[in-house]
């Protein structure tokens, strides 16, 4: 069986990094028709592995676990999209790196959006909060401070 996984998902960066890493893993697997897996939701991770805590993650059903530790680890070769690596990605490996570009998963965008749909218990208070702005213009601003 051709399989790839991301054993360090949740250890390599924070929550935003996890989103890219999960989506890229799925995108690489889909392109090459590989099976794939991610760490189980109850795995303790120092960086607060929390994809299953707030998102439906419907595409990950039956896809939790680890690839064997004897699988080679394939890290990113650059911080930019590596088309050559993407097109020739080997099977039976552990994926690593940040992979912070949608180019790894744009071809399965709808599946990723479905996985990253918020759980009802997250959406309910958000909808309640947003009712106070009904009919008005709302702008959300995210400021990222670097060290």
Task: Put a short name on every predicted segment.
Residues 5-6, 35-40, 140-142:
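A structural signal for short, well-ordered beta-strand segments and their strand-loop junctions
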Residues 10-20:
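A short, glycine/small-residue-rich beta-strand->loop->alpha-helix junction that serves as a flexible
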